[in-house]
Amino acid sequence: RHVTLHNVSVGGNCCIENIQNYIANYEIGSDTFIENVDIILVDRLSTFGNGVEVAVLNETGGREVLMNDKLSAHQAYILALYRHRPELINRMKSIADYYSNKHASAVGSIGNHVMILNTGSIKNVRIGDYCHICGTCRLSNGSVNSNVTAPVHIGHGVICDDFIISSGSKVDDGTMLTRCFVGQSCKLGHNYSASDSLFFSNCQGENGEACAIFAGPFTVTHHKSTLLIAGMFSFMNAGSGSNQSNHMYKLGPIHQGTMERGAKTTSDSYILWPARVGAFSLVMGRHVNHADTSNLPFSYLIEQRNTTYLVPGVNLRSVGTIRDAQKWPKRDKRKDPNRLDYINYNLLSPYTIQKMFKGRSILKELKRVSGETSEIYSYQSAKIKNSSLNNGIRFYEIAIHKFLGNSIIKRLEGINFQTNEEIRQRLKPDTEIGLGEWVDVSGLIAPKSEIDRLLDGIENGTVNRLKSINASFAEMHENYYTYEWTWAYHKIQEFYGLDPETITAQDIIGIVKAWQQAVVGLDKMVYEDAKKEFSLSSMTGFGADGSHDEMKLDFEQVRGDFESNTFVTAVLKHIEDKTALGNELIKRIEAIES
């Protein structure tokens, strides 16, 4: 009723009514409901958002990523950052162009079981099965890749131009997107506005603003006063009022920065790009000195009187870091069996541990050069206090013991060894792949050698399809633990000074005991850190109008008591479990004669 259709095919069991203008050049699937819409049309040969250039990281261009339906965070990372390999970039662009042209059409499609209700203009948009579009203002030149396993919801007041929205995502409540890619199971709402940005799996954006950002998996920003601009993030939480500057009022907005995985910002933090913040670090205050702390992960960056103070490694003992690592896998909302991004959640991996080895060397060298009694050390335009430096070396060594011990226990589990030779054979890696440097390609942790092998394949033309590129990333993700052991075994020899030909059960027992000390020591620090949340100062403001006892009672009713807190009991259980795990291996091999 009240519908004008031009060059439209309609599937079975559809209801289309009250279209103010018309629907033109569309194929509409079955069981679809379209009501109270202004106009739906395709007015030219369209690629539906595929092939649109997104000027990510550098607002003035130079790092453009070509959007496509199959875009993964890892593919985009290489396209944006590996500009030192122009042949690779040209090949990747032509692969993306081939895909875009293959899917170009002058006829749009609306899938099966789609609902489009009370919506304004839909122009040059391809809409997948089971999609809900309700109260949306305008959609122009894009793809909504909804499907039965992971429907997409686009809600009231949304305006999207030049976009792709992947399966399972929800874009709602006045969100405005221009030249944006939205990955799987993202949630954007509450008037969020973004331009020239890429959001990959499980990102959340509410209230604030994004410009030219590369938001890797689990980038979360919830606050009205937060602007993320020209930065690369992943597993990141932005505090309210966090922003960055990419403009120094000289040659325009040409600067960019990186916050490596797990870095987060406190309220009112500010960073003047260019800068690079190490993995799992916390940024507090205003930082204008362009520090690069990528080799000092798990740090605090604190500003005092316009100076950046660095507290290396301290975040390793933070209860918040452990809580973050536990929550990300639980918050992976992707239901689509065909996942675009391969996400490695490990807190300690060859990627972070290699940085700790470097960090430990840097701190020891600072100590040697400036002298052990120096009160303040300078590194990368940041200051490090003497006590912080010594603690940093200790924290990094604890984490290295923990990671290498974990690896060796995993490698030797479930086998009853009779001789040292059997142990040596089991310790030998299954592959040479994994030696050398490792990289975090926006969520995927892999040996640099494997990434380079893929890039060489793209350059010489042996890898020439989007699905082949994604299959290579899948293979690296699949083989992570095999590659990890190759790297870990090499580091075990180096760190503990062992020879693979003469390693004995007693050497292994020594490593396991060091591991037990590290794990229990770290857990105790985390336990003490959690205890601070139950201190008297944390009770301030509880028990309104009451006495001291009522304050404690009110606090316990709301927050529970320390000993029965679920996180605290989990830490205590972790200490027990890990001690038992180490003892089990020691018992299994202690009888072997040297």
Regions found by a protein language model. Give the residues of each.
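Long, compositionally biased intrinsically disordered regions
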Residues: 37, 304-593
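Glycine-rich hexapeptide-repeat left-handed beta-helix
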Residues: 9, 15-98, 134-135, 144-148, ...
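Surface-exposed loop/turn motifs in large extracellular/passenger domains
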Residues: 2-3, 100-103, 107, 120, ...
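N-terminal cofactor/phosphate-binding cores enriched in small/glycine residues
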Residues: 1-3, 7-12
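Long, charge-dense tracts
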Residues: 13, 21-22, 26-33, 38-48, ...
